[in-house]
């Protein structure tokens, strides 16, 4: 008789092949048609809020792998928080203003750019930004990111721009905003000032360094009267025309060293270094100490500008680590130089225009770019005998974040936010202690960046952005910037848009009757715009006003961005918040690392190692990319490449096959009617249920701490080792061969349903497409989405640690049995494990007691036909970790249905080819 039809084989239409590339777009369409995001908002209405505030990506170009990592991790967190019962809306945003877009539009205009008005330029920039907002929105949705995509916050929307101006008004009102002449970082190519957040560093920049003699005009002391120079060292020869002083340090010792018939003053500790540049030594050389009193009365001439003297100043930043211990000081071309110049009343001299060319103030080199000027300056020094030595040095040098070209320091009049007003610097550093940092080192990193930070340069000399709403009296030149005038403009922007600044006259943008102190009502408008970091920095204010789901939520719970944002958005956001609200805008600050190629190299188009997320999705599916995002600790740099994706896809298949096994083996089971009570479950089923709820705790702890890589590792181990290789293996015979409605079979199915229900919910935040598909097969096509479900709760009553401890010991014995079976296969004693009888001699009495307790289940646990426990062993036993095991060929007949070799085979008169269990199952 053929008994194959009596086997309870798994039945499910859930396919083994994922086909994510084809399925995922259909699932997205289904979510949109069902308004899943809106359903979730309605379902969580009134629940505690948990807001992850989106740091706005720049609306320029397609998304890259780093952007994908950022958005996916955010989405996993938001989905997880929603599953935990929080009302966790996700409002995406875009950073729309700024130089990259303006330069792209400028490039597209070509020669017409110079003839294009600011109004037209802004219109084109707006269209360009909107184009990429639409492109990126589609790409983010394809990643499976769920959010309010139809109502994002855009820094170029009238509502948002109005709030930027309103926040600026509050800062004006509180006394934080001022305009002043400062030496700041300047990009000659972009022709604009830059703030600290926009500066990068080239660690391998090569500069021309020069040692220069500045002639001393007066008698210093009885030994030094004529033929004396002050020796300075600089890596920016082009700034020498702007020299106004030589800076000394009162804590250093100075000496005049005879070199080629003249004396050169320098710090004593650097004499050997300076002389070595010319292969000279100090030994036998005349050296005369120079006192502070001598230094204070020095009269120093500029080395090549006639009738200009270089003042003597003192500064703590002058060190004896390099150079000569005397610093060339040009207040118009250095931050420290500027401060020293202010302290000593020096002229803030800067003969360089916005394009980096010398002006008519230095006619000898008028029109020359300063980046090309070093050879000319060196030539002048050589010709007049002032050059002691020149050489190339490699060092770290500031470059523009946008064009990557070297920056200069340039003294210009700019708008600033005062970073010491009302002790905001001290209050902000102290407030860092109230923030949770992931990883924890973020606190110290941020603190170092905030301490002694210079005032925030807010003005930019561009057109695509939010104008600084200041006015200038045409009659007396005084500046008009008040909270009242700024708020008035904010209201105009709210209804008419920001472009009115470029369309209307100043009088139409000011409150009626506005007058200057001189009585004039005639004003000019400021031409500069606000730093775009200010735009995104005030998003915690502005996004609230543009989306009802965020209204009234402050501070938000989470900011999550890459590590570069410590000097960018994280800082830009904290300063306005501390100034206006007195607290940081975020409770938790989470940082992710960079994405690198498989060899750990940075990705560059020129290197041909760029990994496109869209190509990954097209090949593997978004769920595979999402699984990669949690496969490693995202707070560290993450490597990505095709080999890694193949490995991730392999693990995904293991997860998918776990779901397929679960669905297939509960197809004939009605949980509500046929479930077995916990107290009646078979021991291995109770153990599996306990392990499931222990897993929930592990998963929850990992996800609460954003350690998704730990969840991933535990998930793969759970699916592959605990379920597939162990529990599923043990219960397979019972599921397939026990009577369909037997308690033993229903016991296993009861636990399988529990595992499926928990597992699909645990994984849902990470694999939204796959779990949605699984949920449909589990609950039926018309069931509501799994993403509306709550996260599983671990039931402590179902966690039996003593039982888990027992089974840990049993499974160690199982490992020993599997080893013995493998040896028996190798020597052809057996084929399949059911052909084996095993005898076990444990190393510890307690282990035997445990096996005796579960003796009736050992055949099932070890998947053999007979198990005998013995107190003795011989050399036919194989030694394992906790026991000795002997494997023998089964001596009884094989049951043709279950393939076990039992002494009961042939005892049933009706079914002589079956064992007793199988005969009962087929009646």
From Swiss-Prot:
Matching Pfam families: Anticodon_1, tRNA-synt_1, zf-FPG_IleRS
GO molecular function: aminoacyl-tRNA deacylase activity; ATP binding; isoleucine-tRNA ligase activity; tRNA binding; zinc ion binding
Cofactor comment text: Binds 1 zinc ion per subunit.
UniProt motif ('HIGH' region) ranges: 57-67
GO cellular component, one term: cytosol
List of residues binding Zn(2+): 895, 898, 915, 918
Reaction equations catalysed: tRNA(Ile) + L-isoleucine + ATP = L-isoleucyl-tRNA(Ile) + AMP + diphosphate
Highest taxon above the source species: Bacteria
Cellular compartment(s): Cytoplasm
InterPro entries: aa-tRNA-synth_I_CS, aa-tRNA-synth_Ia, Anticodon_Ile_BEm, Ile-tRNA-ligase, Ile-tRNA-ligase_type1, Ile-tRNA_ligase, M/V/L/I-tRNA-synth_anticd-bd, Rossmann-like_a/b/a_fold
Gene Ontology process terms (BP): isoleucyl-tRNA aminoacylation
Keywords attached to this entry: Aminoacyl-tRNA synthetase, ATP-binding, Cytoplasm, Ligase, Metal-binding, Nucleotide-binding, Protein biosynthesis, Zinc
Co-factor requirement: Zn(2+)
UniProt motif 'KMSKS' region: location: 602-606
EC number: 6.1.1.5
The family this protein is said to belong to: Belongs to the class-I aminoacyl-tRNA synthetase family. IleS type 1 subfamily.
Subunit structure: Monomer.
Known role: Catalyzes the attachment of isoleucine to tRNA(Ile). As IleRS can inadvertently accommodate and process structurally similar amino acids such as valine, to avoid such errors it has two additional distinct tRNA(Ile)-dependent editing activities. One activity is designated as 'pretransfer' editing and involves the hydrolysis of activated Val-AMP. The other activity is designated 'posttransfer' editing and involves deacylation of mischarged Val-tRNA(Ile).
Domain remark in the UniProt entry: IleRS has two distinct active sites: one for aminoacylation and one for editing. The misactivated valine is translocated from the active site to the editing site, which sterically excludes the correctly activated isoleucine. The single editing site contains two valyl binding pockets, one specific for each substrate (Val-AMP or Val-tRNA(Ile)).
Full protein name: Isoleucine--tRNA ligase
């Amino acid at each position: 008789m053929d008994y194959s039809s009596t086997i309870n084989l798994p039945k499910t239409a859930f396919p083994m092949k994922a086909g994510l590339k084809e399925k995922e777009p259909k699932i997205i369409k289904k979510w949109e048609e069902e308004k899943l995001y809106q359903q979730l908002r309605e379902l969580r209405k009134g629940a505690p809020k948990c807001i992850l505030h989106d740091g706005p990506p720049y609306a320029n170009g397609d998304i890259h792998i780093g952007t994908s990592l950022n958005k996916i991790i955010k989405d996993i967190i938001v989905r997880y928080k929603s599953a935990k019962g929080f009302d966790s809306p996700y409002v995406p945003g875009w950073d729309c203003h700024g130089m990259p877009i303006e330069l792209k539009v400028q490039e597209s205009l070509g020669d017409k750019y110079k003839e294009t008005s600011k109004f037209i330029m802004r219109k084109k920039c707006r269209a360009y930004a909107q184009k990429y907002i639409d492109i990126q929105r589609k790409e983010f949705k394809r990643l499976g990111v769920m959010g309010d995509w139809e109502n994002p916050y855009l820094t170029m929307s009238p509502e948002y721009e109005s709030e930027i101006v309103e926040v600026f008004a509050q800062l004006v009102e509180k006394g934080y905003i001022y305009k002043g002449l400062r030496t700041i970082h300047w990009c000659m190519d972009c022709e604009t000032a830059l703030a600290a957040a926009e500066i990068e560093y080239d660690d391998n920049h090569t500069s021309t360094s020069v040692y220069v003699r500045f002639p001393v005009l007066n008698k210093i002391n009885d030994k030094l009267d004529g033929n004396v120079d002050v020796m300075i060292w600089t890596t920016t020869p082009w700034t020498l025309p702007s020299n106004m002083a030589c800076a000394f340090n009162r804590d250093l010792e100075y000496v005049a060293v005879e070199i080629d018939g003249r004396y050169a003053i320098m710090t004593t500790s650097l004499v050997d270094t300076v002389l070595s540049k010319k292969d000279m030594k100090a030994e036998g050389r005349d050296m005369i100490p120079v006192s502070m009193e001598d230094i204070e009365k020095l009269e120093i001439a500029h080395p090549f500008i006639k009738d200009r003297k270089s003042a003597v100043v003192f500064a703590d930043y002058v060190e004896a680590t390099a150079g000569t211990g005397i610093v060339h000081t040009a207040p118009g071309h250095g931050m420290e130089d500027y401060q020293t110049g202010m302290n000593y009343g020096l002229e803030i001299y800067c003969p360089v225009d916005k394009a980096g060319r010398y002006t008519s103030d230095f006619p000898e080199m008028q029109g020359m770019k300063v980046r090309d000027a070093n050879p000319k300056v060196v030539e002048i020094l050589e010709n007049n005998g002032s050059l002691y030595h020149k050489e190339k040095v490699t060092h770290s040098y500031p470059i523009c974040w946008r064009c990557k070209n070297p920056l200069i320091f340039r003294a210009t009049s700019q708008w600033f936010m005062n970073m010491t007003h009302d002790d905001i610097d001290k209050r902000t550093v102290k407030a860092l202690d109230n923030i949770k940092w992931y990883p924890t080192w973020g606190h110290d990193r941020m603190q170092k960046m905030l301490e002694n930070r210079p005032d925030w340069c807010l003005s930019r000399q561009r057109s695509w952005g939010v104008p600084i709403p200041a006015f200038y009296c045409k009659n007396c030149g005084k500046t008009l910037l008040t909270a009242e005038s700024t708020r008035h403009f904010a209201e105009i922007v709210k209804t008419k848009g920001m472009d009115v600044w470029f369309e209307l006259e100043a009088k139409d943008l000011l409150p009626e009757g506005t007058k200057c102190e001189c009585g004039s009502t005639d004003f000019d408008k400021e031409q500069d715009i606000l730093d775009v970091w200010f735009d995104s920095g005030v998003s915690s204010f502005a996004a609230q006003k543009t989306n009802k789901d965020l209204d009234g939520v402050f501070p938000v719970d989470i900011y999550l961005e890459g590590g570069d944002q410590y000097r960018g958005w994280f800082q830009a956001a904290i300063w306005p918040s501390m100034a206006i609200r007195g607290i940081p805008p975020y409770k938790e600050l989470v940082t992710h690392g960079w994405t690198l190629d498989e060899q750990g190299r940075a990705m560059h188009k020129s290197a041909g190692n760029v990994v496109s997320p869209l190509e990954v999705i097209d090949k593997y599916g978004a769920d595979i990319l999402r699984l990669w995002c949690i496969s490693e600790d995202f707070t560290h740099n993450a490597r990505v490449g095709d080999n890694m994706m193949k490995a991730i896809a392999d693990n995904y298949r293991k997860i998918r096959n776990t779901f397929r096994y679960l669905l297939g083996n509960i197809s004939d089971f009605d949980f509500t009617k046929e479930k077995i009570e916990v107290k009646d479950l078979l021991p291995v089923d109770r153990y599996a249920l306990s392990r499931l709820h222990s897993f929930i705790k592990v998963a929850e702890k990992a996800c609460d701490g954003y350690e998704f890589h730990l969840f991933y590792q535990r998930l793969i181990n759970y699916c592959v080792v605990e379920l597939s290789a162990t529990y599923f293996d043990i219960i397979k015979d019972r599921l397939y061969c026990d009577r369909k409605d037997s308690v033993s079979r229903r016991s296993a199915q009861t636990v399988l349903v529990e595992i499926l229900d928990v597992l699909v919910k645990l994984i849902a935040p990470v694999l939204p497409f796959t779990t949605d598909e699984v949920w449909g097969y589990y609950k039926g096509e018309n069931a509501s989405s799994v993403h509306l479900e709550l996260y599983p709760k671990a039931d402590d009553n179902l966690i039996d640690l003593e039982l888990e401890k027992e089974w840990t010991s049993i499974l160690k014995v199982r490992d020993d049995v599997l080893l013995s079976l493998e040896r028996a296969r190798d020597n052809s004693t057996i084929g399949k494990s059911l052909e084996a009888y095993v005898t076990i001699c444990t190393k510890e009495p307690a282990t035997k007691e445990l096996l005796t307790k579960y003796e009736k289940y050992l055949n099932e646990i070890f998947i053999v036909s007979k198990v005998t426990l013995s107190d003795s062993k011989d050399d036919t036993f194989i030694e394992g970790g906790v026991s000795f095991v002997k494997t023998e060929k089964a001596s009884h007949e094989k049951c043709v249905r279950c393939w076990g070799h039992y002494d009961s085979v042939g005892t049933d008169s009706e079914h002589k080819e079956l064992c007793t269990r199988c005969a009962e199952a087929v009646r």
